[in-house]
Amino acid sequence: MSQRIFLPDTLANWQWPRHLNPHYAEVKKASAAWAKSFRAFQTKAQEAFDRCDFNLLASFAYPLADEARLRSGCDLMNLFFVIDEYSDVATEEEVRAQKDIVMDAIRNTEKPRPAGEWIGGEVSRQFWDLAKKTASTQAQKRFIDTFDEYLESVVQQAADRNNSHVRGIESYLEVRRNTIGAKPSFALLEFDMQLPDEVINHPVIKELENSCIDMLCLGNDVVSYNLEQARDDDGHNIVTIAMNELRTDVAGAMIWVDEYHKQLESRFMENFKKVPRWGGPIDLQVARYCDGLGNWVRANDQWSFESERYFGKKGPEIIQRRWITLMPKMVSEELGPQIVDGSHL
């Protein structure tokens, strides 16, 4: 008999509601066409990529953005998942080379990419060439710095995978906090802001970011576990990590994740109430930024069930009943995402 899994409703009491950017449909059309133009995947994988609708994720994550900044968000989410799909099947050395290509492309957008280079370089160059036009100087710097950190952690993830290295909970979260790509995503929240370093680096703001990132990590790992175990790629997932360290099963790991998530929620809300005031217009920007962090947690969860990334067409049903069936192993020779057959869930 197939094993059933209960997905904890980690956001049952989260105060940020579902909020979709009104420019979603129009901007999605442009960004999806842009992403598809690179032909990064074969036909079937491209269809699966389209069904994932990473533009929906951006439109939940940046509900107040104007069309230009939403386009940057959509393009970034598409770029993230191009990098993700290629790095997931690459060696540490190959991922290191991919990182070098991407960072060179972002730091030198005026430089044409070499013929025959990995496609991620040109995707990155075009993304940043457009996105930086809508970003403040501080936000540009923070994006580049945090994107470099993100890519370095993806290299580390590849090293762990190649060496079959299974981390403990704390060690895993140290790496996962960067591989999830939250920090560069947060930089987009401040594209139209002028937040000084002393504000963005304030301990309370950092604590808010850290709690938000950990909730994103846990939430994403809960919904992605089934697909990742089916692809035999669940070594970099908190459910697997908790099962190994706590010597428990999937159900036990899910309970642990739910309890830890509640602690993170409390920590976030405590710090949300402690955000200091600097005076003047900066306080309005800080309030928007912190609200954006809270919204990101809801955005990631909502997209996980409304797109077809993890549950095929059954997401809206599963978000209500929470029970799913452990999927059978999936083997694909084709690079890129795979279409999820909801009949297995």
Swiss-Prot record:
<feature type="short sequence motif" description="DDXXD motif">
    <location>
        <begin position="84"/>
        <end position="88"/>
    </location>
</feature>
<comment type="subunit">
    <text>Monomer.</text>
</comment>
<feature type="binding site">
    <location>
        <position position="84"/>
    </location>
    <ligand>
        <name>Mg(2+) 2</name>
    </ligand>
</feature>
<comment type="similarity">
    <text>Belongs to the terpene synthase family.</text>
</comment>
<keyword id="KW-0479">Metal-binding</keyword>
<keyword id="KW-0460">Magnesium</keyword>
<feature type="binding site">
    <location>
        <position position="228"/>
    </location>
    <ligand>
        <name>Mg(2+) 3</name>
    </ligand>
</feature>
<protein>
    <recommendedName>
        <fullName>Delta(6)-protoilludene synthase</fullName>
        <ecNumber>4.2.3.135</ecNumber>
    </recommendedName>
</protein>
<dbReference type="GO" id="GO:0010333">
    <property type="term" value="F:terpene synthase activity"/>
</dbReference>
<keyword id="KW-0843">Virulence</keyword>
<feature type="binding site">
    <location>
        <position position="220"/>
    </location>
    <ligand>
        <name>Mg(2+) 3</name>
    </ligand>
</feature>
<feature type="binding site">
    <location>
        <position position="224"/>
    </location>
    <ligand>
        <name>Mg(2+) 3</name>
    </ligand>
</feature>
<comment type="pathway">
    <text>Secondary metabolite biosynthesis.</text>
</comment>
<dbReference type="Pfam" id="PF19086">
    <property type="entry name" value="Terpene_syn_C_2"/>
</dbReference>
<dbReference type="GO" id="GO:0000287">
    <property type="term" value="F:magnesium ion binding"/>
</dbReference>
<comment type="function">
    <text>Delta(6)-protoilludene synthase, part of the gene cluster that mediates the biosynthesis of melleolides, a range of antifungal and phytotoxic polyketide derivatives composed of an orsellinic acid (OA) moiety esterified to various sesquiterpene alcohols. The first step in melleolides biosynthesis is performed by the delta(6)-protoilludene synthase PRO1 which catalyzes the cyclization of farnesyl diphosphate to protoilludene. The orsellinic acid synthase armB produces OA by condensing acetyl-CoA with 3 malonyl-CoA units in a three-round chain elongation reaction folowed by a C2-C7 ring closure.</text>
</comment>
<dbReference type="InterPro" id="IPR008949">
    <property type="entry name" value="Isoprenoid_synthase_dom_sf"/>
</dbReference>
<feature type="binding site">
    <location>
        <position position="310"/>
    </location>
    <ligand>
        <name>(2E,6E)-farnesyl diphosphate</name>
    </ligand>
</feature>
<dbReference type="GO" id="GO:0016114">
    <property type="term" value="P:terpenoid biosynthetic process"/>
</dbReference>
<dbReference type="InterPro" id="IPR034686">
    <property type="entry name" value="Terpene_cyclase-like_2"/>
</dbReference>
<feature type="binding site">
    <location>
        <position position="309"/>
    </location>
    <ligand>
        <name>(2E,6E)-farnesyl diphosphate</name>
    </ligand>
</feature>
<feature type="binding site">
    <location>
        <position position="84"/>
    </location>
    <ligand>
        <name>Mg(2+) 1</name>
    </ligand>
</feature>
<keyword id="KW-0456">Lyase</keyword>
